[in-house]
Amino acid sequence: EPLFLRPKAYALLSHLARNMGRVVPKSELMDVVWPGVYVTEDSLTQSVREIRKVLGEDMVRTVSKRGYMLAAEAEAAPEISSQPIVAVVRFRNESGDPADEAMVDGFAEDLINGVARFGTVTVLARNSSFSFASFGRAEWPQIRARIGADYLVEGSLRRQGEHVVVAVSLVDIATASQLWGDRYQSHGEGLFAIEREIVEQIVSRLVTRVTNAGLEHAARKPVTSLAAYELLLRGFALLRDPAQTDQRGAEAFFEAAIAKDPNYGLAYTYLALARALDGEFGRASDAVLQNARDLADKGLALSPDQPTGHRVQSLIRLYMRDHEAAEHHMRIALQLNPYDADSIEQMGMLLTMRGRPLDALTWLARGIRIDPLHPHWYQFDRALALYMMGEYRQAAEALELATRPAPWIRTRLAACYAQMGDMEKARRQIALIEDGDPFSPLDYALRGVPFENRADAEHLAEGVRLALG
C-alpha cells in the first residue's frame, strides 16, 4: 500500500536518504528543502514529525545540537529523484570600491533565486554557499564535503559607472573541471535594468549546463542503475531531439522514472508532454489529449509550484483549443519562473495562436536572446508569427533551418514560398511530402494548427492552396 508525504517532507526524506549514515545539519536541510526562502526551524521540525508519523518514530534520528540522520538500520529507501545540488558562492568584487560589495552580493543572490525557480536543480541558499568566497581548485573537495554541492558557480563583477562586466563559471566539483564559463558586459543607463538583463541570461544557461552535465553522466550508466532524475533527463533529451523520432522512447523513460519514484511530479508532467505531442503537435486525438491532461493534473497535484507543470498544462489546453485556460497556465508558469527560456518562447507561440503575432515576436526574440543555443522549434514558432505578419521571406528563412523537415514544416514552408510568388519552390516542398503519407497539407492548415481565430487558419490555408495549385 502506498504511503503519502507532502512535497516538503518528501524532499527532506530524499536528502536524508542520499546522505545515509551522515548527520545532516539543520541549516543544510533547510537550504535544500526551502531553497532561496527564509523559514524557521519550526518548518523543518514539522516535516520531520510528518515523516515519523507516516514511516515510524525511529525512521529519523535527532542528533542533539547537530541535525538529523536517517536511521542506519532502516530498510534501504527506494531510489529517489537525486536532483543535482548547486552552490553559488560569493562573487568577487573587482570594482575596487567597498561600497559595491552589497551590489555584488545581491547579484549572486539573484542568481540563487533565479536557479531555484526552475525546480529541477537544488540550489543552496546564501547562508550556506556564502560561507565560501570564490575558492581555487584545491578547496573544491572541501566545499563538496561541507555543504554537499555537486556543482559550484563562481565569478566576479566589476562596475565602472553604468558599465558592468560579469564573469561566471560553472564547476563540476567531483571532477574538478570547469563545465562552462562566459563573460557578460552591458552599457547604458539604469544599472538595475542592466543587472536584471545579465541575470536573466546567466540563469537559463546555468540550468541548461547543469542539466546537460547530468545527462552526460546518466548516458554512461546502464539504464537499470539510473535514478528517477536521471531517467527523466534521458527522456527529456529524446523530446528535444531535432529529429523528433522517438517520443515513444521518451515515454518509456518517464514511465520508468515514475516506477522508481511514484511521487515524482515532474515525471508525470513530462509523460503528459510526450503524450500530447503524439500526432505532430496539436493533432492528437481527443482521447490522447484527455489522457495527457490527466497526467499533467497529477504532476501539478504532486508539485503545485513547479513552473514546468503549468507550461505543459498550457500546451495541452492549447491543443484542446481552450485558449483562455492555456494563457492562464502560461502566465502562472512565467510568474513562478520568469527566467525559463522555454516558457518565454511558448508564450510567444501562444500569442501567435491567439491572433497577436506582433506581441508574439517580442516574446520569441527574448527567448532566443536568453538561450542562443535554443531548440529547433524556437525558429519554427518564430516563422509562423512572421508569416501571420506577412513577412513571408523571413518566415521561410527560419523554416529553412530545419535539417530533417517533417510534413508540417514542409507545408508551412510551401505556404511561405507560394505567398512570395516562388511557385517552383512551393510545389517542390509539397512534392517532398512522401507518397502514401496520410498527412494532408490543406487539412493541416485548416484544422491542424490550434489557431483561436478562423481567419488565421484561412491565411495559412491560402498559402497552401497556392502551393497546391
Regions found by a protein language model. Give the residues of each.
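Juxtacatalytic C-terminal regulatory tail of Ser/Thr protein kinases
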Residues: 56, 72-79
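Terminal, low-structured helical/coil segments at or just beyond the last alpha-helical repeat
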Residues: 442-469
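Residue cluster at the C-terminal edge of the helix-turn-helix DNA-binding motif
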Residues: 50-57
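Short beta-strand
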Residues: 60-63, 123-124
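Acidic, Ser/Thr-rich low-complexity linear motifs
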Residues: 218-221, 284, 438-452
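TPR/TPR-like (Sel1-like) alpha-helical repeat modules
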Residues: 403-407, 418-440
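Acidic, proline/glycine-rich low-complexity intrinsically disordered segments
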Residues: 3, 10-11, 18-32, 38, ...
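Minor-groove-contacting beta-hairpin "wing" of winged helix-turn-helix DNA-binding domains
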Residues: 62, 66-71
